[in-house]
């Protein structure tokens, strides 16, 4: 969770307590959400493996399956076609939208939403984000900060363990008295 470096803008420092684009600005994260809400959870719940074959095909989602008051959603791939049967590994490498949506269908959007909100501590989610487009393809209502996104991805390099991102360990005065100390608590969020 320790931030080794952060760049919050492209000019020199202009003052103290100014806006930091990496930690203060939220942005749409798009396909970077797929590994952390669809694929890792599909693997964790034994629904898929890297070699599972899923058909890259047209998927039709009705976001309101009870009253049918909303229009159907038909996600598209970047290449505007379908590749047929592909492995999950290929779907990750090529960032195939329709496969990520199908894995999210297997999981249920609430599983992905709860994992982001409670296990990865993403605090910008809204109730509207508990839906297919935000959870499978990253079209979150408020987006995420780069620091939160990097914090979510750290589980892959830390053996399934995540620590809330932090930028200091302790602050001392000129006499060596500890004024502020960061106590970090690593949490296992996925199996290793």
What would you call each of these model-derived segments?
Residues 1, 28-56, 91, 152-156:
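Active-site SXXK
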Residues 2-3, 10-14, 28, 59-62, ...:
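Solvent-exposed loop/turn segments at secondary-structure junctions
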Residues 3-6, 12-25, 33, 142-192:
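A penicillin-recognizing enzyme superfamily signal
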Residues 3-7, 30, 52-55, 90, ...:
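Structural recognition of the beta-strand scaffold that forms the well-ordered cores
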Residues 37, 49, 87, 98-102, ...:
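Extracytoplasmic/secreted proteins, especially bacterial periplasmic and envelope-associated proteins
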Residues 43-49, 61, 99, 107, ...:
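A generic secondary-structure signal for well-formed alpha-helical elements
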Residues 48-112, 174-192:
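Conserved catalytic neighborhood of penicillin-recognizing serine enzymes
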Residues 68-76, 108-149:
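Mid-domain, small-residue-enriched loop/turn segments at the edges of structured enzyme/sensor domains
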């Amino acid at each position: 969770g320790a931030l080794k470096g952060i760049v919050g803008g492209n000019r020199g420092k202009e003052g103290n307590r100014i806006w930091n684009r990496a930690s203060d600005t939220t942005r749409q994260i798009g396909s970077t959400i797929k590994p952390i809400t669809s694929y890792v959870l599909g693997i964790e719940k034994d629904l898929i493996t890297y070699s599972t074959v899923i058909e890259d095909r047209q998927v039709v989602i009705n976001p309101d399956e009870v009253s049918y008051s909303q229009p159907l959603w038909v996600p598209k791939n970047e290449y505007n076609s379908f590749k047929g049967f592909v492995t999950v590994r290929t779907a990750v490498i090529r960032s195939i939208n329709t496969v990520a949506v199908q894995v999210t269908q297997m999981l249920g959007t609430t599983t992905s939403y709860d994992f982001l909100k409670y296990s990865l501590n993403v605090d910008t989610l809204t109730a509207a984000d508990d839906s297919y487009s935000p959870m499978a393809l990253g079209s979150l209502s408020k987006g995420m900060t780069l620091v939160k996104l990097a914090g979510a991805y750290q589980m892959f390099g830390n053996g399934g363990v995540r620590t809330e991102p932090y930028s200091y360990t302790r602050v001392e005065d000129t006499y060596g008295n500890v004024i502020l100390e960061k106590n970090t608590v690593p949490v296992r969020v996925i199996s290793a």
